[in-house]
């Protein structure tokens, strides 16, 4: 990887490589764009196969956060942090050392919890910096509001594809039954949707069967089901050259991040196949909305009102895609980049005045 060329192509402002010997720490903080506000992005801790994989993850996810904030009309930019470590080696000393790196950015980057980082870990990080979210329990966690946003996104996709506001009788395959996936199943079940579910943890799948009458399928079978909607709520990169040919769903709308293994190639494959794709960073913006409201003083009513905007934003994106003959992924980027450009122009005019 040519580092500066990659950073330039992706539009990043800053990439911070964090290294320490006592305790030993390797971390990367990627700041993509701060036009709309400070970069917000969670921290994940993973034993990446190599440093390049960690960097790619940070760069791609931070860019996605920029687009997510812009599409959600949140005054924040995009960032992401990755700690390269085995979860078994996670210690308070390591987390506090990381917190000091975050603090050195003086509020330019605000972080929270992601893979292998717990609320308790966030509280440990907060001993070294105030630039974290997820310390307060007032917001009740991001899962309820994230799942609501995904549910509203599914409704928007159904309206765009079939000009219908009804979900009853539709068949939906949900991949991944963590907190968001489980909450989404509850919303869908309440609207008389026929659920098909899969999870690498059989206990979670059986719970969905018991609670929501879902049909449990093997993780490898979830792609090829004859369903109306496929909702990926687990890992990223699952929409790829291997899985897309198996898809029978006409809509993809789920909570997982970075669903497209290759954004350009695989969004085009979905479009050619006639599948309406709901861009992940738009439909799953509820989590960002939740933590942003926590940062400014949590107001549940305001947060839930903001998440309802996901419905209208997706309808606008679907319309742009149709009118301009582009993929929905490109349409979402254009919407986000227009909002960022408009903000830059407004700031330039204000400075000139």
Curated annotation (Swiss-Prot):
Disulfide bonds: none annotated. Catalyzes the reversible oxidative deamination of L-tryptophan to indole-3-pyruvate in the presence of NAD(+). Cannot use other L-amino acids and D-Trp. Involved in the biosynthesis of scytonemin, a cyanobacterial radiation-absorbing pigment. It holds the Pfam family ELFV_dehydrog. Keywords: NAD, Nucleotide-binding, Oxidoreductase. The active site is at residue 80. NAD(+) binds at residues 44, 114, 146, 176-181, 204, 255-257. GO terms for biological process: amino acid metabolic process. It catalyses: L-tryptophan + NAD(+) + H2O = indole-3-pyruvate + NH4(+) + NADH + H(+). This is L-tryptophan dehydrogenase.
